[in-house]
Each structure stands twice: as C-alpha cells, then as structure tokens.
Amino acid sequence: MAFFNPEKFTSEAIAKLKTELSDKAIIAASGGVDSTVAAVLAAKAVKGNLLAIYVDTGYMRLGESEYVSSMLSTLGVKHKVVDASEKFYAGLKGVTDPEEKRKIIGELFIRVFEEEAKDYGGKFLVQGTIAPDWIESGGGLRDTIKSHHNVGGLPEDMEMELCEPIRELYKDEVRSLAEYLEVSVSQRQPFPGPGLAVRVMGEATPERTEVVRQACHIAENEMELAAKEGIMELPWQYFAVLIPVKTVGVQGDVRAYGNTIAVRAVHSYDAMTAQAVEIPVSYTHLTLPTICSV
C-alpha cells in the first residue's frame, strides 16, 4: 500500500473542490469522522458558499445534535440543524428489513437535502462517502454486503450534483487526515449512516429506538470507562442492539418480562472486516444492571 500523505491530499482535494464546486453547496454532516473531514475540506475550498446540514432523523445518539452543532461551530463550518424525525419515523413505519431501512433512509435524506438546497440556493451535494461505502454497496461484479444510505440508497432522480472528495480513501486514511486537519472526532468510533434504525432489529418505532439509544449510551460509556481503568482494551466499535424478542427474568423476588438487549464489541483493522472482542465479566457486572433499568 502506498504511503498516505494527508498534507498532500489536503492540498490536492481543496484545489479540486475549488474547481468542482462552481456554485453554492450543501454537505450532509452527521458528526462522524468521514462527513466532518469532508465538511472541513469543502469549507476550506469554498468558505461561505458551503452550508453543512445536520439532519436529526430521530435515530441519532443521545445528545448528538447538540454535540455536532458545537463541534461544527468550533471548526468554523457554517451549519444548520434540521429536525426531520417525524418524517423518518413515518417513512420507516412497519419496515423491519435492515436493507429496506437503509434505502428508505437514503431517499429521505436526499429529499430533505433537496428542500434545504432550494432554500439555500445550493446546486451541489457534498458527501463524506469513503471506499468501503461503495465497495459494500455492490455493483458490477461486487456482491452487495449492505447498502450504504449515501450510495445504495440514493434516488435516481436526485436533483443535485454529487461531490465526494474522500471517496477513494479508507478508514485509516480518513482518520489520519482528520488528525492532520485537527478534527476532534478523528478517533470517534464509527456510527451507521442510518443510525439507530439498524440497531433496532424489527420495526424502529420511536419507543423502541429510545430504548436502544439509552442502552447504547450506557454500554459505550461503561466500555470507555473500563478501557481507561485497564479492565479491557477499547474495541474499534462497541454498541447495544435491541433484539425483537422479549424474555422472562427476575428482579428482586418479582417476575419480569421485558426487552432483550445485546452488547457487541469488535476489532477491525480495515473497517470492512471484524473480529469479535471478548467482553470481560467485570464489565458485564458493572453494566448490565444499569442497562436493565432502561
């Protein structure tokens, strides 16, 4: 593999963006590493002609909207927060298949961005698409592993011109670029584009989504604490999933019947393959009682 030079890539990407973005542009900013890096590059290229749109789909992490807004302000990226949660909840009503969820969310994202682009006068849509996104989404001789909402979910009648400045980069290269650009989320763990909708197995209703939102927050915080205390190595990705099966348990001396939450942790060196991480018993002793209270 050729050595990745973030300084050289930044210079070339900004020059290319100055040529490509001949009019006002908006960027889909999720707060993740990929979209934030793309936003910083585009902002350096076209400055005030870029508006970052953060869409609150209702399937975001706990406190995410406030976090992303603060981060973009610190980075000097002009942005707008759009609450489209009701639109996304309605679009996923009755949907249980994760692949269908991804495609519906992809189309809804574009429709929201088209509305915002009309208000702003934007002609271009910048996205933080990276190599694993289009590889996993299939096409040609490649099998579809999973459709990424920013690839397989894009509608054919999209009105904006697409610009993807980091499309050829892999996750480790994006993180290296983020560190060079002094982006605070450079080592933030990956979060799926469709959000918690794909961490709710079955229908992602607002109520079920809130359960997994709280569970993810607890599981992630406790795992980060365990890593700091030397109980375990911090995994590459770690989160909770709501299983569509209820189970019987005992709380005190009383029968309990409630949701089933799974906690998953994996290591990955390329952001495309993963190996399960053995979670220490001491972590589960600390975390499970809190998750069970959700």
Task: Locate the predicted segments by residue.
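ATP/NTP-dependent adenylation/nucleotidyl-transfer catalytic domains that generate, transfer
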Residues: 1-286, 293
